[in-house]
Curated annotation (Swiss-Prot):
Reported function: Plays a role in limiting the replication of viral DNA in keratinocytes. Recruits the host NCoR/SMRT complex to viral replication foci to mediate repression of both viral replication and transcription.
GO cellular component terms listed in the entry, alphabetical order: host cell nucleus
Subcellular location: Host nucleus
Gene3D superfamilies: 3.30.70.330
InterPro entries referenced in this protein's UniProt entry, alphabetically: E2/EBNA1_C_sf, Nucleotide-bd_a/b_plait_sf, Papillomavirus_E2_C
Protein known as: Protein E8^E2C
Superkingdom classification of source: Viruses
Broad class of the protein's primary localization: host cell
Region (Disordered): 33-74
Length: 184
């Protein structure tokens, strides 16, 4: 029964069905033949069986509509987004960049052979007071096969802590050091 109700609700798009009546002779003043055509609402006493239609809620528009693709929603801000734009290290002349965007932290990327970086990360446990966090060894994806360098990222509370780290810890010559800022 539920399937029948569902099928009927799909067939009818509104609460009215329009149909042509039977041509009959109606007693009129001129005694002419007329066509009895009328619209009968569902569920009235006109002899039409009531078809149960499901009550449909009006479709609400989503908050973010994509103007280029109307069937797709716009994504909101990404998880790591902030109000600061991305500035490459080469084009950046702002020395107070960490202050300009409060959700950034000073970092160092150590790049080199994966095994050397793993040993270095183990040795860094002696200097825990000189950094905030250290990542595991990671790689960039979708790069050409020529560059097999692994990366370890270290975060710091301040640039002075990062400078103390660089002045204290001996970094192997085969490991390159890149300083910068990261959005946290």
């Amino acid at each position: 029964m539920a399937i029948l109700k569902w099928k009927r609700s799909r067939w009818y798009s509104s609460d009215e069905i329009s149909f042509a009546g039977i041509v009959t002779k109606l007693p009129t003043a001129n005694n002419t033949t007329t066509s009895n055509s009328k619209t009968c609402a569902l569920g009235t006493s006109e002899g039409v069986r009531r078809a149960t239609t499901s009550t449909k809620r009006p479709r609400t528009e989503p908050e973010h509509r994509n103007t280029h693709h109307p069937n797709k929603l716009l994504r909101g801000d990404s998880v790591d987004s902030v109000n600061c734009g991305v500035i490459s290290a080469a084009a950046c002349t702002n020395q107070t960049r960490a202050v300009s965007c409060p959700a950034t932290t000073p970092i160092i990327h150590l790049k080199g052979d994966a095994n050397i970086l793993k040993c270095l990360r183990y040795r860094l446990s002696k200097y825990k007071q000189l950094y905030e966090q250290v990542s595991s060894t990671w790689h960039w994806t979708c790069t050409d096969g020529k560059h097999k360098n692994a990366i370890v990222t270290l975060t710091y509370i301040s640039t002075s802590q990062r400078d103390d780290f660089l002045n204290t810890v001996k970094i192997p010559n085969t490991v390159s050091v890149s300083t910068g800022y990261m959005t946290i």
